[in-house]
Amino acid sequence: MKLVDEAEILVTAGHGGNGCVGFRREKFIPLGGPDGGDGGSGGSVWIVADENVNTLVDFRHERTFKAQRGENGMGRQAYGKGGEDRIIVVPVGTVVINVQTDEVIGDLTRHGDRLLVAKGGKGGLGNMHFKSSVNRAPRQSTTGEEGEERLLKLELRLLADVGLLGFPNAGKSTLIRAVSSATPKVADYPFTTLYPNLGVVSVEAYRSFVIADVPGLIEGAADGAGLGTQFLRHLQRTRLLLHLVDMAPMDGGVDGVSPADQVRTLERELERHDPQLLKKPRWLVLNKADLMFEDEARAAAETIVAELGWTAPWYLVSALGRDGTFPIMKDVMAFFDRQREDELEARNAG
């Protein structure tokens, strides 16, 4: 199934029911007092995260969601029935944004998370509330309040531990195939990956993490070039970025961009889109070593690392041949283990 990761919807809560003007009409009580009941509250609109849903594709066909109106009050002090709530089901990892204010009003990261996005209107008051010493038979009631209405933007952000970052055709899809059971399309042309792919990497029994292969980025991605910013958001939840670089064409690089300049270009795009992305741990993966002699590949890798002044971990691999891929995954697992230990230690200290 193709991932649809953005949608815009209009939600409208139900109006409250109107209050009733009514009077007691009983035998032997000719001048019965007011007994008009209150209107019922309008239904509200809720968004609920469900782990069994994995795309926003249904919102292409249905974009307007309304909750039920509250029923009007009735005589004999009978309250109107409240309107039914409207439940909208979305994938886990959905961010809800108010389009008018651009405010994030909710981030649904766990199965069963619920978010109230439009509150139903209160029911109107019946005339039984307006009886007084000077007005024994009031004909006054109030109408129900209008329900809230909001235009919302839904953004699905993948819940992955590791994000693969790189130019188109850097070998991200090949790497995720090599280390997980995911089977993204792989071919020797840019933008083979048009939708994000998720793979589960198992290092040992009961020890695994999720890795995301997002479509390749190009210069100007922060402005929407190539496949634009729609996939950069998927990197925001990751705990570690693996920056893949096609290091084989040292004589001019990919489309005339050297391997070191590929890294610098994408760093600029990350900073323009979200400076926090550059603060995430990021490891360099120099791919396609199989296209060079072993000594030549090692020397080329060291040249790139020196040119960048790279101080974080780096690896020389052939994703196609799976050479050097397992040590990366083993190191990633160890990195997450250390992270968990540090977090536990910090909680205990607090």
From Swiss-Prot:
<feature type="domain" description="OBG-type G">
    <location>
        <begin position="160"/>
        <end position="337"/>
    </location>
</feature>
<feature type="binding site">
    <location>
        <begin position="213"/>
        <end position="216"/>
    </location>
    <ligand>
        <name>GTP</name>
    </ligand>
</feature>
<dbReference type="GO" id="GO:0003924">
    <property type="term" value="F:GTPase activity"/>
</dbReference>
<keyword id="KW-0378">Hydrolase</keyword>
<dbReference type="Pfam" id="PF01018">
    <property type="entry name" value="GTP1_OBG"/>
</dbReference>
<dbReference type="Pfam" id="PF01926">
    <property type="entry name" value="MMR_HSR1"/>
</dbReference>
<protein>
    <recommendedName>
        <fullName>GTPase Obg</fullName>
        <ecNumber>3.6.5.-</ecNumber>
    </recommendedName>
</protein>
<feature type="domain" description="Obg">
    <location>
        <begin position="1"/>
        <end position="159"/>
    </location>
</feature>
<keyword id="KW-0479">Metal-binding</keyword>
<dbReference type="InterPro" id="IPR006169">
    <property type="entry name" value="GTP1_OBG_dom"/>
</dbReference>
<feature type="region of interest" description="Disordered">
    <location>
        <begin position="127"/>
        <end position="146"/>
    </location>
</feature>
<dbReference type="InterPro" id="IPR045086">
    <property type="entry name" value="OBG_GTPase"/>
</dbReference>
<keyword id="KW-0963">Cytoplasm</keyword>
<dbReference type="InterPro" id="IPR006073">
    <property type="entry name" value="GTP-bd"/>
</dbReference>
<dbReference type="InterPro" id="IPR014100">
    <property type="entry name" value="GTP-bd_Obg/CgtA"/>
</dbReference>
<comment type="function">
    <text>An essential GTPase which binds GTP, GDP and possibly (p)ppGpp with moderate affinity, with high nucleotide exchange rates and a fairly low GTP hydrolysis rate. Plays a role in control of the cell cycle, stress response, ribosome biogenesis and in those bacteria that undergo differentiation, in morphogenesis control.</text>
</comment>
<keyword id="KW-0342">GTP-binding</keyword>
<feature type="binding site">
    <location>
        <begin position="287"/>
        <end position="290"/>
    </location>
    <ligand>
        <name>GTP</name>
    </ligand>
</feature>
<keyword id="KW-0460">Magnesium</keyword>
<feature type="binding site">
    <location>
        <position position="173"/>
    </location>
    <ligand>
        <name>Mg(2+)</name>
    </ligand>
</feature>
<dbReference type="GO" id="GO:0000287">
    <property type="term" value="F:magnesium ion binding"/>
</dbReference>
<feature type="binding site">
    <location>
        <begin position="191"/>
        <end position="195"/>
    </location>
    <ligand>
        <name>GTP</name>
    </ligand>
</feature>
<dbReference type="GO" id="GO:0005525">
    <property type="term" value="F:GTP binding"/>
</dbReference>
<dbReference type="InterPro" id="IPR027417">
    <property type="entry name" value="P-loop_NTPase"/>
</dbReference>
<dbReference type="GO" id="GO:0005737">
    <property type="term" value="C:cytoplasm"/>
</dbReference>
<dbReference type="InterPro" id="IPR006074">
    <property type="entry name" value="GTP1-OBG_CS"/>
</dbReference>
<comment type="similarity">
    <text>Belongs to the TRAFAC class OBG-HflX-like GTPase superfamily. OBG GTPase family.</text>
</comment>
<dbReference type="GO" id="GO:0042254">
    <property type="term" value="P:ribosome biogenesis"/>
</dbReference>
<dbReference type="InterPro" id="IPR036726">
    <property type="entry name" value="GTP1_OBG_dom_sf"/>
</dbReference>
<feature type="binding site">
    <location>
        <begin position="166"/>
        <end position="173"/>
    </location>
    <ligand>
        <name>GTP</name>
    </ligand>
</feature>
<feature type="binding site">
    <location>
        <position position="193"/>
    </location>
    <ligand>
        <name>Mg(2+)</name>
    </ligand>
</feature>
<feature type="compositionally biased region" description="Polar residues">
    <location>
        <begin position="130"/>
        <end position="143"/>
    </location>
</feature>
<feature type="binding site">
    <location>
        <begin position="318"/>
        <end position="320"/>
    </location>
    <ligand>
        <name>GTP</name>
    </ligand>
</feature>
<dbReference type="InterPro" id="IPR031167">
    <property type="entry name" value="G_OBG"/>
</dbReference>
<comment type="subunit">
    <text>Monomer.</text>
</comment>
<keyword id="KW-0547">Nucleotide-binding</keyword>
